[in-house]
Amino acid sequence: MAKEAFLRKKPHINVGTIGHVDHGKTTLTSAITYVLAKKGLAQKMAYDQIDKAPEEKERGITINTAHVEYESDKRHYAHVDCPGHADYIKNMITGAAQMDGAILVVSAADGPMPQTREHILLARQVGVPYIVVFLNKVDMVDDKELLELVELEVRELLNQYGFPGDKIPIIKGSALKALEGDPEYEKNILELVEAMDNYIPIPERPKDQPFLMPIEDVFNIEGRGTVVTGRVERGTLKRMEEVEIVGIRPTTKTVVTDIEMFRKTLDTAEAGDNVGLLLRGIKKDDVERGQVVAKPGTITPHHKFNAQVYVLKKEEGGRHTAFFNGYRPQFFFRTTDVTGTVTLKEGVEMVMPGDNVEFMVELISPIAMEKSMRFAIREGGKTVGAGVVTEIIE
């Protein structure tokens, strides 16, 4: 029992497999669990256990995702694998599975294919910070020069999309052979895990980031003043600290004179806490749902941005028809809807349900915004799309 408690001390990292259909993403995921299970660091997961991923809902969108856990000597990994290409797009855009790093699987027999490109581009757009490459099926390639060519091609492709292609670790192997227990190929799986350990840094924990709390409700407490409530998204806050209220209206500064949780006073609020903050000198009408309380100078309001968006199919509860330039839905950021106008890219006539598309949005009021932030697109309270901010314009 004591051993179990000790294991939880390892730092936690979220990863996932990406790459073209049939290049071996799920086989690799399974192989990692098989090889690490021999060292007592994972539970074996067979290919079909992973492939029959259960459906999940994220922001009103149904996604099939398999979640696998394993450990290296240094770390604890949560690994996501999606059966279908559309699931990947939805997963990456909604941030259902936020990745600290991705394992790009490329078949050595085929080289990079269209979805290889699409997944690298998506990783860049949604802010996946690190990629390691597993060059799979090398047992099917006899020609060493051909292998080198494929490796060069992959590095070139990564460079094209703004990843450091020359520095990224590329591990060659065969997931299937490793699954079959071939010791030579099992070694490659351990090399891959080692590359992940060394190349993907441990992310900064939400607690260590600058304080931010989206406002969900505003109350007036007789004789005390205005209280805003919400769930702390990141960072920590102490009583009597100065904060900014950002978004929708001009930014204002105030001091948090009291922090309450479950009707008790707290000295410090931290990421994950549901709290009420008493704000000095702020009237109930000065603040509203949709604004954020943040550490001064750490987040700014914006109204114009580029986004990568997945538009729901009719079967997913989305629109039944295409939309055109000038489309004006609601954009749901954190806790509130803001109306915005869509400008499609040059040469794009319309957007169909089921499309994965990039366009510009101009909101009618500014929102506290950061690159890689997620949002939903809604019409009359119904989700019709999911998006991520790829670039802030103004």
Swiss-Prot record:
The keyword Hydrolase is assigned to this record: yes
Protein name in the entry: Elongation factor Tu
Family: Belongs to the TRAFAC class translation factor GTPase superfamily. Classic translation factor GTPase family. EF-Tu/EF-1A subfamily.
Pfam family of the protein (one): GTP_EFTU
EC id: 3.6.5.3
Domain tr-type G, chain residue ranges per copy: 10-204
Keywords on record: Cytoplasm, Elongation factor, GTP-binding, Hydrolase, Magnesium, Metal-binding, Nucleotide-binding, Protein biosynthesis
Chain segments carrying region G1: 19-26
Region (G5): 174-176
Originating species: Methylacidiphilum infernorum (isolate V4)
Primary location group: cytoplasm
An MF annotation (GO) of this entry: translation elongation factor activity
Subunit structure: Monomer.
